[in-house]
Amino acid sequence: MSQMSSASVKFPDSVPGVDYPKQLQLKYLQVIFRHGERAPVKERLGSAGIPKDWKLCNNARRFFAQIKGEKEWSVLGFERKVESPVDTSLAAPTSDNSPSGVCIHGELTDFGRVTTRTLGEYLRERYVKQLKFLPDELNNYADVYMRATPMVRALESLEHVFSGLYPESKRKMGLPVIFTRNWSDENLLPNENNCPRLVQLYEEFAERAAKLYDPLLAGRASEMMSQFMNGQPVRVVSSHPRLSGLLDTINAAIGSHVDFNPNLRDEQWLRDAETAVVEEWFGGYKVSKLMRQLGAGSLLNDLSMRMENFVVAEKNGSPYHRLALYGAHDVTIAAILASLDAFDYRWPPFTSHLEMELFEDTSSKSDSQNQSGDNKTTDLKLFSDESTDASNSAIVAASNSARDMSDWYVRITYNSTPVVMGACRGQGYKGNDTICPLSIFKDTVRALKPVEYHTMCKPVKK
């Protein structure tokens, strides 16, 4: 969603198989991913050789439609062209002489369609073939929950990931359901449009980043870039374009293999610029609980509740989907990791992905069953006083809840590498801090829940 982007994600040469303790059984999986490579969201750096028109959207030539009277959905092909007005009134379009396959601003490029499909194929190799957690064929669309933001590139990326995970030959006829929300209800990214207070926080931390990094950018970076910016120096916030916009365009070009002035590929310049922009956008998550609450708290609680609901359904023998896929953005990935103190403070590349895996420790089941009689007796002795029924009921519920969660664990992998959440350091499963007790994860995200979201989002008068 933001104007910053980075290079493409790298998939491992060999897909890992079982890389967790054998006592643990994978039960539930949520995958949150950034969309694939896209065109810049705005025309910039033409003087550096970055073209206005990107002829990299040749695959955007079909859509699904159901024709009246037909039982099946059909693929309708079309030739798409981008037209431009001939004058400032924007009323009179040009004649039909534009090339085919030109991307509109922010559109998923052909490269982005490939990498998101590759992500789906990676997930298939790992969770279907290697771990045998997911079925080879998807015969019931209720077994998967899918959701994307209203941004077309996020929705299309989700479609490509799903198609890589379950190609047409591996799923039943018909169409799966993809859920979206109105922007006023969207929490699959930090929703600045719906939260004025979050906008204020971003502005405050952007100014802080400018004070920290503008002196650094005043040297070599400005010398390199000023020729492409009408002689002006590079600044985090006050230059035009601002630094995040420059870096977004550069990395969008790198991601989709668009050629441009080699000076802009200088590694030190790109690293300094990335450090400053990451601080601008996500430095606040290091120090502000409110930033975490408004930027990621609602989504984290959604993710946690799905895992908790699965545990309850598993205990009751009720049906519940085992897989959730979320088409999201760079800011989604970073906000989640930063709010959990697990972020490396590098901008998430295109098609970055988080796998949130829920495990059950099955080795303790037999022990708990053997002790169930003693536990029931103890419970009866503890809660036999009728005068305290109400309070005891709450204690029993809390006790049962803790017991229900005691054998369940969460692991988050970021671009195929497990991460350690801050609250789980020293608390992991048998010394493995990447495998976090579900109870600790739940308590951590509950503390970030924006209970009165709309009240908390009201701007503060300055």
UniProtKB/Swiss-Prot annotation:
Its EC number is 3.1.3.2. Disulfide bonds: none annotated. One of its GO terms (biological process) is phospholipid metabolic process. GO terms for molecular function: acid phosphatase activity; phosphatase activity. CDD domains: HP_HAP_like (cd07061). Transmembrane segments: none annotated. InterPro entries: Acid_Pase_AS, His_Pase_clade-2, His_PPase_superfam, Histidine_acid_phosphatase. Pfam families: His_Phos_2. The active site is at 35 (nucleophile), 330 (proton donor). PROSITE patterns: HIS_ACID_PHOSPHAT_1. The keyword Transcription does not apply. It catalyses: a phosphate monoester + H2O = an alcohol + phosphate. It is found in: Mitochondrion. GO terms for cellular component: mitochondrion. Keywords: Hydrolase, Mitochondrion. Belongs to the histidine acid phosphatase family. PANTHER family: 2-PHOSPHOXYLOSE PHOSPHATASE 1 (PTHR11567:SF110), ACID PHOSPHATASE-RELATED (PTHR11567). This is Probable acid phosphatase SPBC4.06.
